[in-house]
């Protein structure tokens, strides 16, 4: 297989990958879960245990809005129910250089995405007749300089029971503690069930064939480390899974919100859809907690609302870092991302880090690249003998195949030797592709000049054009031209086909491919010099 045919194989693999990506985006089949059921409840609060099936109507009014802030996010809390109705991520701009924080959670007439939690059950304070109206003095609470954590308690009292809903902010963390401290002085035992859910407008995932993005639910259970559960899945079948530990989440490209309940108890993961209001909720329901008279009880949970920071999320809950979904190429993407991050820490530029990683990858693959060109050179030398066999055996394909295999063995030539570097290069490319789609660290990461966001397409298409030119040069430097006229025409169009597809790819990925082509050209010339000395190659006239 010569270089030009290698390009054709690469193109077929590449286009097949894009077609598969679009098919995955479009099909949205119902997902088979461990257990599915229809939950009859409104979208603000789930039903409690079967024996005490209560639900609460959607809140039509607001309580007082208070603001909580640490060094990475600013939250707005509704004192009616204690829901988180807004989260502004202070270290991430909404748009490139906008200087306006990206708002992940928000509640507007056009779009709802909020984090709700409460206490349901026999003595729950979130009931069909209304939700708990918490009290607190002050409106703004901010983590002070030198302070590592901040606790903000909301207070509600009813029938001799004092409920504190305590929000705990930590420095440098998007992990918000949401705890309940219950003091039962009612004279009799009470029973409550904690829940937490993420309520989101039902929308379709966005993006295109080159850069698909997922917006929808996901969960982790004792049986399933990580699984996406789209809004279409929720509309087809409401989720209901009993599990030890686990978590539920809503993913939005580079960002995620996730409820993490107490990991030491059994929880039920569920979804609720409200077609009338076009919203869906994914949440957890904890076990019944009995609090004897005169006793106190603390119920813990946490809410992650922020970017997909793999290292931090891994410390918050098992498998939460899997929301950075690299697909089947994860085993390549993870070390590549680690290498990218390590080099970026040295050079302080993600574009330079990509160039360095490309050099490392090409250096690792160099022995295979050398073997590829050596195999191709030997195959060219054998062409006269192979043509003679074709003429001698004519239509006897079996005999011709046997004789050719014998010839390959005698000459120590592997006819598939030219394919291996191409086949190894594609998984690396796909792994980098998913890294650019999933790694928030590359969002709005500049290179230089006109490239100010390596996760977005080149605004002036300069890199894709340069990449196409490099492919054309690489093709022209191929030592043996394709003899079949039809195949020749196809090969001549390959650089244009690739350039067209790469117009919409992340500029960082195009940069990788461009640098890879340039290194391949340099390696090719180095290898050819060695082959010329062995008489296996001659310069094209």
Curated annotation (Swiss-Prot):
CDD domains: 5TM_YidC_Alb3, EcYidC-like_peri. Its main location: membrane. InterPro entries: Membr_insert_YidC (IPR019998), Membr_insert_YidC_N (IPR028053), YidC/ALB3/OXA1/COX18 (IPR001708), YidC/Oxa/ALB_C (IPR028055), YidC_ALB_C (IPR047196), YidC_periplasmic_sf (IPR038221). GO terms for molecular function: membrane insertase activity. It is a multi-pass membrane protein. The chain crosses the membrane at residues 6-26, 337-357, 416-436, 454-474, 495-515. GO terms for biological process: protein insertion into membrane; protein transport. Residues 34-56 are annotated as: Disordered. One of its GO terms (cellular component) is plasma membrane. Pfam families: 60KD_IMP (PF02096), YidC_periplas (PF14849). Keywords: Cell inner membrane, Cell membrane, Chaperone, Membrane, Protein transport, Transmembrane, Transmembrane helix, Transport. Belongs to the OXA1/ALB3/YidC family. Type 1 subfamily. Required for the insertion and/or proper folding and/or complex formation of integral membrane proteins into the membrane. Involved in integration of membrane proteins that insert both dependently and independently of the Sec translocase complex, as well as at least some lipoproteins. Aids folding of multispanning membrane proteins. Interacts with the Sec translocase complex via SecD. Specifically interacts with transmembrane segments of nascent integral membrane proteins during membrane integration. This is Membrane protein insertase YidC. It comes from Haemophilus influenzae (strain 86-028NP).
